[in-house]
């Protein structure tokens, strides 16, 4: 039972968890089924073979070392009448290293390793065609990346100091040098400065930049200053003050921007006020150039964010496990989320609201007409199409897009329709294009940057969860 009086009920069969019941949002209930002696052929005796949660069902098959080799996920969207099954298959070696991933559309991605057991190459194969995602990774004697040669011709080179900290990174694409970055550290490995020497590329993207950082005796960031010179020019300067207990008490920011020869500048001086009773670490008000007011629930989740500068409220709803269930932006949109049993987001529904006046009273109606399915770290789909993500260990190295959305991805479970030929051609085109620089994004060290690739969404409704 949490501070709001919400509770979860757990049911066991001996030592096996079989059910999780939620007191407020029963649609988030979870059910597990385990393998018996009859499931020995898929190495599932005593292991979870079926998981039922808010997103749908998952069926599992296992290898001899207990690794998941097949995962069938059937999704049941609450606002749609159809269900979608998306399988993924995995192959491992005797060291439990991933050898192959088979995507729902039939593409087989293989992982090769060097004699030291480190990842060396990542390639894909589909319909007889081969795609190189990573041609080669080279390592230094300390097993740190020294050079990465990507399949689209992009190259990255890494250098380290005597303490094995990254000291220099150079990235080269077809247009030239994208990054030529130096890193400098203090005695306790805080970053002193980051400086990029690579200039503007022929397509006007990129540019040189530098940021310097200063810390107090407790290694907290107190001052940062930086600039960027490219097709346009940007300068910023920020300072932070802290209370004795470590809470931020003040933040000052100056920015100067020259865009297309036009100068603009901004400045804010914000002071943070905290709850002095039951939640001493929750910000109740930020006053200054931009006034904000916040309200929190008993569990410490943000319920209301009043933006005095923009003039609107944002309201949030959370479930028993402190997962964001919904966001309402008055005058903008409603977003609703679903999660699987592991707490991973699987669905996002969004839509705009409409207002009607009946007999002098306003009535508000919301329509959730857009959806995004996060099938796994490897597949993201919406009504326009789907994106496949590729990884080298925990690092995402490439993305490819396909058309047709969930329906077409679901059809790919059987005979592949003609649309996958179009997907293949488009993917080749993107891989060729990504050898050229399409996008350059630079953010302060303390900021959080979402994916900005043109085929990957940016979750705007969550952007101000960070200050």
Show the residue positions of the predicted features.
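Beta-turn initiation residues at beta-strand->coil junctions
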Residues: 1-5, 13, 19-26, 49-60, ...
């Amino acid at each position: 039972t949490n501070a709001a009086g919400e509770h979860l009920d757990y049911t066991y069969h001996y030592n096996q968890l079989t059910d999780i019941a939620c007191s407020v949002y029963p649609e988030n209930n979870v059910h597990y089924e385990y393998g018996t002696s009859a499931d020995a052929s898929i190495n599932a005796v005593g292991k979870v073979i079926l998981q039922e949660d808010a997103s749908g069902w998952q069926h599992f098959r296992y290898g001899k070392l207990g690794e998941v080799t097949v995962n069938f996920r059937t999704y049941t969207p609450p606002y749609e009448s159809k269900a979608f099954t998306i399988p993924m298959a995995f192959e491992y070696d005797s060291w439990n290293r991933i050898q192959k991933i088979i995507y729902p559309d039939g593409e087989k991605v293989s992982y090769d390793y060097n004699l030291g057991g480190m990842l060396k190459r990542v390639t894909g194969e589909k319909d007889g065609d081969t795609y190189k995602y990573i041609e080669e990774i080279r390592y230094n004697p300390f097993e740190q990346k020294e050079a990465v040669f990507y399949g689209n011709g992009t190259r990255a080179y890494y250098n380290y100091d005597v303490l094995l900290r990254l000291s220099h990174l150079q990235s080269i694409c077809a247009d030239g040098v994208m990054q030529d970055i130096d890193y400098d550290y203090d005695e306790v490995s805080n970053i002193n400065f980051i400086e990029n020497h690579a200039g503007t590329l022929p397509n006007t993207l990129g540019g040189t930049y530098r940021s310097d950082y200063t810390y107090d005796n407790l290694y907290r960031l107190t001052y940062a200053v930086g600039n960027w010179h490219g097709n346009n020019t940007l300068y910023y300067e920020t300072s932070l003050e802290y209370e004795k207990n470590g809470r931020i008490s003040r933040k000052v920011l100056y920015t100067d921007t020259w865009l297309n020869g036009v100068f603009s500048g901004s400045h804010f001086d914000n002071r943070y006020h905290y709850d002095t009773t039951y939640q001493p670490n929750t910000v109740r008000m930020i006053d200054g150039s931009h006034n904000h007011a916040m309200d929190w629930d008993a569990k410490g989740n943000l319920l209301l964010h009043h933006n005095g500068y923009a003039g609107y409220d944002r309201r949030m709803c959370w479930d028993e496990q402190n997962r964001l269930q919904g966001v309402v932006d008055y005058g903008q949109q409603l977003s609703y989320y679903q999660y699987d049993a592991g707490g991973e987001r699987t669905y996002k529904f969004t839509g705009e609201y409409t207002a009607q006046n009946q007999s002098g009273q306003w009535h508000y109606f919301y329509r959730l007409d857009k959806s995004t399915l996060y099938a796994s770290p490897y597949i993201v789909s919406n009504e326009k199409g789907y994106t496949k993500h590729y990884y080298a260990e925990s690092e995402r190295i490439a993305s490819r897009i396909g058309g047709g959305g969930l329906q077409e991805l679901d059809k790919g479970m059987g005979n592949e329709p003609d649309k996958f030929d179009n997907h293949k051609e488009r993917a080749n085109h993107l891989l060729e294009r990504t050898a050229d620089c399409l996008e350059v994004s630079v953010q302060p060290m303390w900021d959080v940057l979402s994916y900005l690739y043109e085929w990957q969404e940016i979750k705007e409704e969550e952007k101000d969860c960070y200050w």
